[in-house]
Amino acid sequence: MPRKGPAPKRPLVNDPVYGSQLVTQLVNKVLLEGKKSLAERIVYGALEQAREKTGTDPVVTLKRALDNVKPALEVRSRRVGGATYQVPVEVRPDRSTTLALRWLVNFSRQRREKTMVERLANEILDASNGLGASVKRREDTHKMAEANRAFAHYRW
């Protein structure tokens, strides 16, 4: 086993257009096959569409959407005496942000709109209004944690 410990987190640079680390993280989540300029075009286009539809700062809309999607609890598998229990645990802040961004991007890819820009923009707008598949995913995660609350004493 390695003895050096975990690798240090690399600092994220602020996004050049909006000056936000969240937008940088979103670009990195949209990124496929190393095509960063395409990912930036998709994210900036989606944020611009969100600005046109709401008339407010798109970074504020994105933050509101993330707050509605971030999970507070999740279940982790824990093996105890031959049985595997789904143990509810609290989610660290950095992981909750990562999960929220991942869910936003994945569920926007499954939407029916024509372009990825429209899909991402509409998923962000839906999430900021408390609607959409990514918010439903968060609710399902919380329901699973609540249903398995009896195993909470197995937390580690």
UniProtKB/Swiss-Prot annotation:
Keyword RNA-binding appears in the UniProt entry: yes
Keywords, sorted A to Z: Ribonucleoprotein, Ribosomal protein, RNA-binding, rRNA-binding, tRNA-binding
GO molecular function, one term: tRNA binding
One of the GO biological process terms: translation
Pfam families: Ribosomal_S7
UniProt KW rRNA-binding keyword: yes
InterPro entries assigned to the protein according to its UniProt record, in alphabetical order: Ribosomal_uS7, Ribosomal_uS7_bac/org-type, Ribosomal_uS7_CS, Ribosomal_uS7_dom, Ribosomal_uS7_dom_sf
PROSITE patterns listed in its UniProt record: RIBOSOMAL_S7
Any single GO CC term annotated in Swiss-Prot or TrEMBL for this entry: small ribosomal subunit
Record text on subunit structure and interactions: Part of the 30S ribosomal subunit. Contacts proteins S9 and S11.
Role: One of the primary rRNA binding proteins, it binds directly to 16S rRNA where it nucleates assembly of the head domain of the 30S subunit. Is located at the subunit interface close to the decoding center, probably blocks exit of the E-site tRNA.
HAMAP family, alphabetized: Ribosomal_uS7_B (MF_00480_B)
Record-stated family: Belongs to the universal ribosomal protein uS7 family.
Protein name: Small ribosomal subunit protein uS7
Taxonomy of the source species: Bacteria, Bacillati, Actinomycetota, Actinomycetes, Mycobacteriales
